[in-house]
Amino acid sequence: GVPCRCDSDGPSVHGNTLSGTVWVGSCASGWHKCNTEHNIFHECCKE
């Protein structure tokens, strides 16, 4: 999957570890949205 930044990863600075995964639509069952950004077409999720 495509990595994305969770709030727990810290500020969006180049070089930070991206612990989330982009899901089109909403997060898969058993996953949760991990940031507060509002995206219409995808969510940043983690297990």
Curated annotation (Swiss-Prot):
Modified residues (Hydroxyproline): 3
Position of the signal peptide: none
Keyword vocabulary terms for this entry: Disulfide bond, Hydroxylation, Ion channel impairing toxin, Nematocyst, Neurotoxin, Secreted, Toxin, Voltage-gated sodium channel impairing toxin
Superkingdom of this protein's organism: Eukaryota
Presence of keyword Disulfide bond: yes
Keyword Disulfide bond appears in the UniProt entry: yes
This protein's GO CC annotations: extracellular region; nematocyst
Residue pairs linked by disulfide bridges in the UniProt entry: 4-44, 6-34, 27-45
Stored InterPro entries: Myo_ane_neurotoxin_sf
Subcellular location: Secreted; Nematocyst
Main location (coarse class): secreted
Molecular function GO terms recorded: sodium channel regulator activity; toxin activity
Family: Belongs to the sea anemone sodium channel inhibitory toxin family. Type I subfamily.
Function: Binds voltage-dependently at site 3 of sodium channels (Nav) and inhibits the inactivation, thereby blocking neuronal transmission.
Record-given protein name: Delta-actitoxin-Cgg1b
